[in-house]
Amino acid sequence: MKLSRQFTVFGSAIFCVVIFSLYLMLDRGHLDYPRGPRQEGSFPQGQLSILQEKIDHLERLLAENNEIISNIRDSVINLSESVEDGPRGPAGNASQGSAHLHSAQLALQADPKDCLFASQSGNQHRDVQMLDVYDLIPFDNPDGGVWKQGFDIKYEADEWDREPLQVFVVPHSHNDPGWLKTFNDYFRDKTQYIFNNMVLKLKEDSSRKFIWSEISYLAKWWDIIDNPKKEAVKSLLQNGQLEIVTGGWVMADEATTHYFALIDQLIEGHQWLEKNLGVKPRSGWAIDPFGHSPTMTYLLKRAGFSHMLIQRVHYSVKKHFSLQKTLEFFWRQNWDLGSTTDILCHMMPFYSYDIPHTCGPDPKICCQFDFKRLPGGRYGCPWGVPPEAISPGNVQSRAQMLLDQYRKKSKLFRTKVLLAPLGDDFRFSEYTEWDLQYRNYEQLFSYMNSQPHLKVKIQFGTLSDYFDALEKSVAAEKKGGQSVFPALSGDFFTYADRDDHYWSGYFTSRPFYKRMDRIMESRLRTAEILYHLALKQAQKYKINKFLSSPHYTTLTEARRNLGLFQHHDAITGTAKDWVVVDYGTRLFQSLNSLEKIIGDSAFLLILKDKKLYQSDPSKAFLEMDTKQSSQDSLPKKNIIQLSAQEPRYLVVYNPFEQERHSVVSVRVNSATVKVLSDLGKAVEVQVSAVWKDMRTTSQAAYEVAFLAHLPPLGLKVYKILESQSSSSHLADYFLYNNDGQAESGIFHMKNMVDSGDAITIENSFLTLGFDRSGLMEKVRRKEDNKQQELKVQFLWYGTTNKRDKSGAYLFLPDGQGQPYVSLRTPFVRVTRGRIYSDVTCFLEHVTHKVRLYHIQGIEGQSMEVSNIVDIRSVHNREIVMRISSKINNQNRYYTDLNGYQIQPRRTMAKLPLQANVYPMSTMAYIQDAAHRLTLLSAQSLGASSMASGQIEVFMDRRLMQDDNRGLGQGVHDNKITANLFRILLEKRNGMNMEEDKKSPVSYPSLLSHMTSAFLNHPFLPMVLSGQLPSPAIELLSEFRLLQSSLPCDIHLVNLRTIQSKVGKGYSDEAALILHRKVFDCQLSSRAMGLPCSTTQGKMSIPKLFNNFAVESFIPSSLSLMHSPPDAQNTSEVSLSPMEISTSRIRLR
């Protein structure tokens, strides 16, 4: 009956569309014949052409009409399927609830031209492709002599006769913004003295040089020094003695970071430099991140950098590159069809960035030229031979010894220009070291430069001094347009510094804070966008209470705390326990302060009369529906107190740039609840239990879930009230393996004792089957009605019994992962409802939940997986979730890099297990010719594919010992940690696995991109605290920030208010950052329900924002440092595939 009624409605809709379209066609097709007398047998030529145009127009209208009817037909088919998949009755099988069909939403298609880029990628030539390099390297690690991981280097004495060796010695100090001490403690004890001495000691001699990287420290020092010191720093920068390299807020990790935060900390550093020093960095310096990503390379290139340096690369790769003389190369993006992303990169060849490993291949000799280690000091040389102070009596022999190392090192490169860094961690903090290093080297330089037969020119230099000399040398050698340096594509993970010591442990270490970081990124982005638009409204309506608020100062602090956490010993989980607490406290405090900014900004935007805006410094009128009580606790949902007399206002924000249908879930104090939409209509509600523990329901709190439809970047108001006439539906519960007494309260709860029925849940897209332990076993996609194996298992990895064991950095397992064995059959709880259904399995160390949403569109097509992990009781174990399928991926799998691009991987038998673990920021997938299985992640973790058909993700690790990389402790401060995922199974169309094997690139589907965005940017519900501040205040039903959805493949990365050039306030401009994503069209997109289309990267800027006019829109470099030479106000953006662009926008 229900089915026929739905068909009647939609049949009527089709009939109406047809009749209305025909009416329009006839109306538009009416011809204006001449009013004069008609001559028999003649028809004017002009009228014939008009008639032909009308006929052509009618044909186009018919085609459009056919397309509309086709779309409606597809919607009817989807509806019929959803109705057929309705409740089935028996408790053991799925009752999927209602499958919601989005009103007036048709599945839009991508423009075929937007599919071309992905299909063309992968055929372009590279001189060096890192996937191929791994095939070539034997990884046999023979003893190389004095250069243990290398080989013996020889040279002829006359090699520099035609062109002398040019050496640049670059003094530096690597300052971790937190590691063994907190950021503040390091600054107090070390860094401030480095800066103070730098100003004094560089002024003593104009030939002295120094480079600095971390702006977080420089900004902190700048705030406490006097004007004469500030002027001295500016003078050193102007005359080239001091160079700022990279200039980010920190030297960021490149494995576990997301590109949003990488860009943000770059902008924060570069904006600070522009305002305070007027300098623009042009050389990248990354000597300590544990492996290197091409994402960072791309960001530097688009920020305007010309060259960069990296250090921590697998020792076997360094050896291979040294043999091939490819340590300097143009690093090109895998996806680049041309060479627009090329940036010149220098890879340091030896073990470390310290002085013993930077002058040449023999650390025993190089250590003798680290003059801080002179006898009588605190440090010595581990090789047993101390440095000697340089004097007239030994300068000749010492100079020749050092020059020999420089010459040997130069043999690994293709030019006669050599870089020799001079520094280490927190060096130059004592004024005596400045004297010891500079004065001794000055004597060596003076001697070498005075001896023509040595054929060397040596000096102190900055990093850019070196690269400028290198490019000058190359320009002289260049013949016939052939580059001296090869083009390279790929990444440099996973890093190993010696033996089988792979640094794949830190991809997962301290996962609690990796998740907290991702939440912070989403909240900061929300605060940035809402604040800027609220600021524009406040300026328009002269709302001084908002304009004078400390919000911009608070926002800047949040940016800096997030930036600090991108440091390569912060987000990586590789700092001391108390330093981790310091990072966590900063994030926690900023999350709280961002909630105030979001609440106040949203309140202003949703107000009908902006002039009635009020604010309370102590709290926001709009409060988040979740609260985190401390830096190391999981967020908990607040309970909204309802009454029948006065409704509570719930304002929901959609942080996504497309129109969106998603589930909103809040907690209330009553099960008899009604939710009213912005139109005042009751919406369908699922009321579920809030569980005190796995068997006991709360009598004071209930979860209310409903489907919300929100505009892009929009706010919508719902009302919630207690009502006996509510249209809510109570969820039903079915308990398996229950040996205790469950308290059901108002809910129907059934013990499934000795039931032979399989556990299943389903929606209109998927049917999932589970074993009696509550773990998923199989899935049926209703698109093709085929059932496939899809098993979820948990595993333990231990650590080796050798002397070196796993720690914060290293993963050194004791063999293959061992199945998780539960002490008893797990208790399983099945929820069945109208909005969602789920299966929860309670293990000793994991509470594992798989949920399906009964929604048409994006969220209904994947499985939500949440794991609450608690391994505080175990020792030297790492817990993993494995997803197994029959997909024949042939040892090939894919992980993303920084949420920006996909990197193909190969499980290599010649490498140890730990080498086949790679970083995953947002997704990993495997595929064969028929299917792709994607695991989407809301936090950065380590991932692998140890066998065909498998994806493994590491969820937490607890290790009781140090792994001898300087931290001096294990990882045993574990927290109860929430990991959130989605699993997506897609059909591939007509794919060739041989082409997959050859291709160095791969792209997610559009559905996968969208699902990842939904996962990382969920709806944000906010509750009006109490009643409205004044009876006169009214709220709009919704506030649309954008006029319409952005194209499906364009992501609004940020709308970031730009700082004022004076004071600590804001300017009139914002940085609008856009990213055009590339997607694979070879995956099924049937009935995806996308409320957007693609436009080949083109967007009209004047039509972008709703309620805001665009005064100016001027393209810029990524971090706002540069404007293109032809930069001018423009009205259209045209983004190329994969590109991220920043523009300065002024709204009113």
Swiss-Prot record:
One of its GO terms (cellular component) is Golgi membrane. InterPro entries: Gal_mutarotase_sf_dom, Glyco_hydro/deAcase_b/a-brl, Glyco_hydro_38_C, Glyco_hydro_38_cen, Glyco_hydro_38_cen_sf, Glyco_hydro_38_N, Glyco_hydro_38_N_sf, Glyco_hydro_57/38_cen_sf. Liver. The chain crosses the membrane at residues 6-26. GO terms for biological process: in utero embryonic development; liver development; lung alveolus development; mannose metabolic process; mitochondrion organization; N-glycan processing; positive regulation of neurogenesis; protein glycosylation. Inhibited by swainsonine. Residues 1-5 are cytoplasmic. Catalyzes the first committed step in the biosynthesis of complex N-glycans. It controls conversion of high mannose to complex N-glycans; the final hydrolytic step in the N-glycan maturation pathway. This is Alpha-mannosidase 2. The lineage of its organism: Eukaryota, Metazoa, Chordata, Craniata, Vertebrata. The gene is Man2a1.
